[in-house]
Curated annotation (Swiss-Prot):
One of the record's GO molecular function terms: argininosuccinate lyase activity
Stored Pfam families: ASL_C2, Lyase_1
CDD domains from the UniProt entry: Argininosuccinate_lyase
InterPro entries in UniProt: Arg_succ_lyase_C, Argininosuccinate_lyase, Fumarase/histidase_N, Fumarate_lyase_CS, Fumarate_lyase_fam, Fumarate_lyase_N, L-Aspartase-like
Reaction equations catalysed: 2-(N(omega)-L-arginino)succinate = fumarate + L-arginine
EC category: lyase
Family listed: Belongs to the lyase 1 family. Argininosuccinate lyase subfamily.
Lineage: Bacteria, Pseudomonadati, Pseudomonadota, Alphaproteobacteria, Sphingomonadales
Main location: cytoplasm
Pathway: Amino-acid biosynthesis; L-arginine biosynthesis; L-arginine from L-ornithine and carbamoyl phosphate: step 3/3
Encoding gene (name): argH
Enzyme Commission identifier(s): 4.3.2.1
Protein name: Argininosuccinate lyase
Keywords: Amino-acid biosynthesis, Arginine biosynthesis, Cytoplasm, Lyase
GO cellular component: cytosol
Length: 468
């Protein structure tokens, strides 16, 4: 027996039967796209105002529609969005409630509009706000990193390559690396916001509309820079969502790297940081454990965010122009990416603000592993006139001999040093301190405490001027 068509459906006139129950379930997006209710109502109010101003509908109908939409916004804000699968999506949910409130004029709201340009408009508005909220989260993380970098501009730690001690750096300098990554992340979201800020509204289904609409007016009312120039492009492309997911994936990679370092630094072999109770968990069987779960979860969320970009790319990669229902799944993907990144940023900011750094252990490890060997090679170039490659060879021989004796370079016996090269004297070796090493790195972007403080001041000045 065929299902009876739903007379309240917005599109059921040409159908003799209603959808199967499973069809209704797979077709409905209201459980997901109800998050667009504020954007949908805002866009509908702008559209109704334009219809009235252009005399496409009467001023009385436009006013009634606006009052009804304002009431719906109040209802949804107070009680949430009702979920009725028969209404499919947020657009039809709003329109159905509007009809209950104002009657026949509600049917005039959709004049010169399709759900294709409606959803594209809502989605761009939502993504625009999402870019701004992620930017605020990145700014908060930058601020926390800058504060901790300022506190530790002089604190010495080992710099690593291949996770082997390489050269001494300051903890402040190390943290500033993540400030720079966050700066570029903010730039990517700003670029994404700028490119998405064009209005699809008025493109209708795909070909535009025969009504004398004012697309510039609705674009301006919604804060867009301009209407989109091609109606097919307006309803069919989701590159703005892809760009958001790409920026989110890169930001998540940066967060994951910092999270990994916190996990490593908190481990007993390193012991560089003490995790606060607020950002740790324990074990159900081992009472001594303090696990860096917050950092591990941030690291894990990066996989979700990388997957979000891939998922959305696979959805859109083979779609012919213009609209296909595959695009219904774009919103769940982007919503999930936003939620994961926003939560990760908040968690990482909290950890950075409250980590206790064990700078004594950091300095001790920084002074091991022949970390000042490059300083000795540089001295031989500057003071003894050796070509760098020869100096590199000489210092390598010194390190090899020190390893054989089980000592660090400053403790290499004078006779052994002199046997390698006469310029390597006890006084020279004694000057190979980690403090002298970091102080000498005065090149722009270097780890010298003076340079670190300059970089912090520059970053704060840029933030104050909105130039991150």
């Amino acid at each position: 027996m065929a299902n009876t068509p739903d007379k309240s459906s917005m599109w059921g006139g040409r159908f003799g039967g209603g959808p199967a129950a499973i069809m209704q379930e797979i077709n409905a997006s209201i459980p997901i796209d109800k998050r667009l209710w504020e954007e949908d109502i805002a866009a509908s109010r702008a559209h109704a105002a334009m219809l009235g101003a252009c005399r496409i509908i009467s001023a009385d109908d436009a006013a009634a529609i606006d009052r009804g939409l304002a009431q719906i916004a109040e209802e949804f804000a107070e009680n949430g969005v009702p979920v009725d699968l028969s209404l499919e999506d947020i657009h039809m949910t709003v329109e159905a409630r509007l009809k209950e409130l104002i009657g026949e004029p509600a049917g005039r709201l959709h004049t010169a509009r399709s759900r294709n340009d409606q959803v594209a408009t809502d989605f761009r508005l939502w993504t625009r706000t999402a870019c701004e909220r992620i930017d605020a989260g990145l700014a908060a993380l930058q601020s926390a990193l800058l504060q901790r970098a300022d506190e530790h501009a002089d604190s010495i730690m080992p710099g690593f390559t291949h996770l082997q001690v390489a050269q001494p750096v300051t903890l402040g300098h190390h943290l500033l690396a993540y400030v720079e990554m966050a700066r570029r992340d903010r730039g990517r979201f700003a670029d994404a916001r700028r490119r998405l800020n064009e209005s699809p509204l008025g493109a209708a289904a795909l070909a535009g509309t025969g009504f004398p609409v004012d697309r510039d007016a609705t674009a301006a009312a919604l804060g867009f820079d301009r209407p989109m120039a091609n109606s097919i492009d307006a309803v069919s492309d989701r590159d703005f969502a892809l760009e958001f997911c790409a920026a989110a994936a890169i930001a998540a990679i940066h967060l994951s790297r910092l999270a990994e370092e916190i996990v490593i630094w908190a481990s007993q072999p390193f012991g560089f940081v003490a995790l606060p109770d607020a950002w740790s968990t324990g074990s159900s069987i081992m009472p001594q454990k303090r696990n860096p779960d917050a950092a591990e979860l941030v690291r894990g969320r990066a996989g979700l965010l990388l997957g979000a970009f891939q998922r959305l790319a696979v959805i859109v990669k083979g779609l012919p122009l213009t609209y296909s229902k595959d695009l219904q799944d774009d919103k769940e993907t982007l919503f999930g990416a936003f939620d994961a990144l926003a939560l990760s940023l908040a968690a990482m900011t909290g950890m950075v603000e409250t980590l206790s750094f064990r700078t004594d252990r950091m300095r001790a490890l920084a002074a091991s592993g022949y970390s000042t060997a490059t300083d000795l090679a540089d001295w031989l170039v500057r003071e003894a006139g050796l070509p760098f490659r020869e100096a590199h060879h000489v210092v390598g021989a010194c390190v090899r001999r020190a390893e054989e004796l089980g000592v660090e370079l400053p403790a290499l016996p004078a006779a052994d040093a002199a046997a390698i090269h006469a310029a390597v004297t006890p006084d020279v070796l004694a000057a190979l301190t980690v403090e002298a090493s970091v102080a000498s790195r005065m090149s722009y972007g270097g780890t010298a405490p003076e340079r670190v403080r300059q970089a912090i001041a520059a970053a704060r000045a840029a933030a104050a001027q909105g130039q991150d």
